[in-house]
Amino acid sequence: MEEDLFQLRQLPVVKFRRTGESARSEDDTASGEHEVQIEGVHVGLEAVELDDGAAVPKEFANPTDDTFMVEDAVEAIGFGKFQWKLSVLTGLAWMADAMEMMILSILAPQLHCEWRLPSWQVALLTSVVFVGMMSSSTLWGNISDQYGRKTGLKISVLWTLYYGILSAFAPVYSWILVLRGLVGFGIGGVPQSVTLYAEFLPMKARAKCILLIEVFWAIGTVFEVVLAVFVMPSLGWRWLLILSAVPLLLFAVLCFWLPESARYDVLSGNQEKAIATLKRIATENGAPMPLGKLIISRQEDRGKMRDLFTPHFRWTTLLLWFIWFSNAFSYYGLVLLTTELFQAGDVCGISSRKKAVEAKCSLACEYLSEEDYMDLLWTTLSEFPGVLVTLWIIDRLGRKKTMALCFVIFSFCSLLLFICVGRNVLTLLLFIARAFISGGFQAAYVYTPEVYPTATRALGLGTCSGMARVGALITPFIAQVMLESSVYLTLAVYSGCCLLAALASCFLPIETKGRGLQESSHREWGQEMVGRGMHGAGVTRSNSGSQE
């Protein structure tokens, strides 16, 4: 009966890449390949027809064809001149985002004094920015998944630039409240630059490159403080708002150089455009393109919220939402607390200052002094060691443990602030706390694009960013309003939140260290091959000895 089916001779070895595609190349020694054999059987296969005569679907094409996926092309082309240019351009977007965020801690006390605003209106001025970011983050993610990463990013940057400059001309409080809210709406799309950036990076360089992009965030925060030192005393806050939009203007001019993500193009069926993009990158990097045919991924609905809550991603999504919430809640809370603590001298000084203020005037205020700006600059510089520490540990401990460690150290530093310490020790504790909470934020930006597939990557990052904005929305009322009632309760809230976030990081079901980016919502490419004739008897074995 076996002779009726086929004559046993020799079974040619087929090499399957981790992404699912395959090739006949015998000298292909790339890591992650496995030889698949049937023990004890040597077969010469003859062509057979399907019983029903149906054609094999395109996505189930013959795995012995010379084919490659975008992941293979990105890995083969490697990191080069193109990625360096993209790093600088993406970094400009991050620098602009950081400056718009940092300006809140500088603008709030200035307007508090200049316009005689009560504390709740000062807090609302900060919160309205985060309301805009929260309401738009998911929208920008959906636009990026539906219409392309470049499209979503370009529109959001132009939007932010326009309303950022307009807000400098606000005549009264209500106007600046509305305009800064619209600025926040645009900033909600800036994190999509990470989605675009990550999809052009080879696996080994991805974590390091995304973390190094965060250096631009640190540069942005430091530059904003330095700019405020020189601009605020002479030109005032309006010029500070205008000059803070310069990085956005540069990005808006240069963003037309950006290509669309090849992964997005393949997923949306634009094979020719994806190949053209990959050839452009290969030319700029001076690297060869892989031989063979680019596989077109099975076209799926993109940017659907329900895909974030499939059984495979449900817990990941919920835990990530809380992690991002805690990151932003604690990070921006610390930024706002820093100016309050420096003005008071220490934690105990806030209580004594509160009594003096109440006796004098409910609208009493203090402008930031030169000493306050310098100490603010020192704590802002902590962003740089935060990047370096995270860069060193993220590929050693993994993404989950890195986030957990950062949350724990921030929580510990927050508890130490309960002690009435001098200004120097206060600055040191704030420096360490900010370094590690920014490191946790950076690790989350590495993990999130890695854990979601291309079809929902932008939406996943967008919803996480939206939850971060919820935390940032709430934090002014803790760091600026609750602080007046109880300093210790305020610090306890931040410390407790980060301890819970550390636990959430440990319970994330997927560790993405060493994983390639997924193209499909299917966990493994082999699941897309279900239905294809693979009925050979025997045991499947890989060179590594593990079953695939």
UniProtKB/Swiss-Prot annotation:
Against InterPro entries, the record matches this protein to: MFS (IPR011701), MFS_dom (IPR020846), MFS_sugar_transport-like (IPR005828), MFS_trans_sf (IPR036259), Orgcat_transp/SVOP (IPR004749), SVOP-like_MFS_dom (IPR047969)
CC per GO annotation:
basal plasma membrane; synaptic vesicle; synaptic vesicle membrane
Q: Molecular function (GO) terms listed? A: transmembrane transporter activity
Question: Where are its TM segments located?
Answer: 88-108, 123-143, 157-177, 181-201, 210-230, 239-259, 317-337, 374-394, 402-422, 425-445, 458-478, 490-510
Superkingdom per UniProt = Eukaryota
Q: Which PROSITE patterns match?
A: MFS
Keyword set includes Transmembrane helix: yes
Example of a GO biological process term = xenobiotic transport
Give residues where Phosphoserine occurs.
Answer: S25, S31, S542
Tell me which UniProt keywords the record has, alphabetically: Cytoplasmic vesicle, Membrane, Phosphoprotein, Synapse, Transmembrane, Transmembrane helix, Transport
Vesicular topological domain: 109-122, 178-180, 231-238, 338-373, 423-424, 479-489
Membrane topology per the entry is: Multi-pass membrane protein
For this protein, the record's Pfam families field holds: MFS_1 (PF07690), Sugar_tr (PF00083)
Q: Which residues lie on this side of the membrane: Cytoplasmic?
A: 1-87, 144-156, 202-209, 260-316, 395-401, 446-457, 511-548
Q: Where in the cell is it found?
A: Cytoplasmic vesicle, Secretory vesicle, Synaptic vesicle membrane
The primary location reported for this protein is membrane
Q: Which PANTHER family match?
A: MAJOR FACILITATOR-TYPE TRANSPORTER HXNZ-RELATED, SYNAPTIC VESICLE GLYCOPROTEIN 2
The entry's family comment says: Belongs to the major facilitator superfamily.
Name of the protein: Synaptic vesicle 2-related protein
Q: Which organism is it from?
A: Homo sapiens (Human)
Please name the taxonomic classification of the source: Eukaryota, Metazoa, Chordata, Craniata, Vertebrata
